[in-house]
Amino acid sequence: AGFPTAVKLDAHFEDGGYILVNASECEPGLKHNIQQIEEEPEKVIRGVKLCMEISGADKAIIAIKKKNRKAVEILDECLKDEPNITRHLLPDIYPMGEERAVVRECLGIELEPSQLPSAAKSIVINSETCSRVAEAVDERKPSFLKHLTVRGKLNGGHDAHVFMDVPVGTSVGALIERAGGIDGEYGEIVMGGAFTGKSTTLDAPITKTTGAILVSMPFMDLHGASMGILVCACGGNYERMQELCKKYNAKEVSHCYCKQAQEMPNGSRKCERPGNCPGQVSNNLQFKKDKCEYIIIGNCSDCSNTVMASGPKMGLKVIHQTDHIMRAVDHPLYRTLRVS
């Protein structure tokens, strides 16, 4: 997230290419991208056309989850006279918004972890970014505003609060107060999504890449129970998972990486095939061998499903890194696979 749009659009496709618009709103519980498509579809589509013109792309595909029926209907109406812009329906699983997953779902091309979308003659751009491109060209407006979702353990309930055009630099605390304030005790405040966000503070400023502010339920106290950590490229890194282990008052005794979490030269990890799991039995066996009572996992929808296929049978108690947030936003926990 945050890669400069100007650099992306400097592709100069000579024989045509694709603008792939990521409207998946990949992280669970977020609503601002879909709300903008419902309210300002023309601005988003105008931005898509400008991105096509700048890059030389001759086609565009808007990738959106099929569960968002109202937004899909609005897009279909707006695109009926746009032969070069189509939409593609995505399943409601995480991480359908990962850029290589978008390429795979829209074009049927499986990219290696080290490859960029340009290897598939495509550029992946978020739907909000498309609208900002339209503002920059048509209104000569610099990019200093952000759409985001505030949600969680707030006064007034767990429904999403969508704030549009929030100035970058606004504090986390100010936005939480606009959403009603925190309801009593809570676990942590996360800036970003439940999977890839980081813990933050009330005085921290939002940035151009902030998509959400989430207030979690309090953490369970595991009273020093032994815990294994399963790190997935689609979720929190090892340091984030260690932080959560401590917040649950557990003792780390083992950690493993999903075998698809390929380490990149910069030390980060990317999933070999995002959203498609190879199975997690070997990691669960290691956790069992290391005498873990609990395991905390940061896996995608499919990988979480495979963890659950064997982990509980081995006596392992499974916690997902998003549990404390999913409970706060009234979202199903990531365990067995649900696809819509």
Regions picked out by a protein language model, each given a short descriptive name:
Residues A1-E105, D221, G228, A233-Q262, ...:
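Iron-sulfur-cluster electron-transfer modules
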Residues K8-H12, P113, D138-R140, M217-H223:
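Short boundary motifs at domain starts and secondary-structure transition points
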Residues L20-N22, R151, G298:
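Short beta-strand segments
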Residues E25-C26, D92-Y94, N155, S171, ...:
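Short, glycine-/Ser/Thr-/acidic-enriched flexible segments
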Residues I61-V172, R178-E185, G193:
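Hydrophobic alpha-helical positions that pack around
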Residues G181-M227, C232-A233, E243:
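Ubiquitin system architectures
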Residues I296-N305:
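N-terminal glycine-rich "phosphate-gripper" loop used for MgATP/nucleotide binding
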